[in-house]
Amino acid sequence: PYGGKFIGVGDNENSGRPLVFSNRGEVEMIEGLAEAYNAMDVESFTEYFAEEVEFKSYDGKTYNYKKSDLTQAFKPYKSIDWKLLSIVPLKISNTDAASGAMVLSTETRVFKNGKKWKKELMELIYFDLEGKISGMLQFAR
């Protein structure tokens, strides 16, 4: 079933097309990502990412990472608890375009210095045609 509408930035061949649920393994990939992230398993965690990743943080900052940069992701943390609440994978109808998923979650990070970071998150996770994460856009409260 069709629903929603892709508008995009500027006119392009996909502008105005409906969105459909995607079934390219995005749900399983995000569940695996969460498992690796919570275990702070660098090797498994980095396998989910493309060679280059754009991360737009909830605080308005944009970070461009190479996959090799992600090996340092867990360095400041004692523990991480990312709890997935929902995963909605979508793609533009009648295209072979990259897909994305809306992910609602909570996350608690405990730093090695004892400081805690706890947020409710809404993230848009973008997958390239190879099924690797190529971007993330994060909102928090």
Model-derived features with residue positions:
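A short hydrophobic beta-strand element
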Residues: A97-E107
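Ser/Thr/Gly/Pro-rich, low-complexity flexible regions
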Residues: Y37, E51-E52, S134-F139
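Short, cysteine-centered beta-strand-loop-beta hairpins and adjacent loop/turn segments enriched
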Residues: T108-K118
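A solvent-exposed, acidic/Ser-Thr-rich amphipathic alpha-helical stretch
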Residues: V42-S93
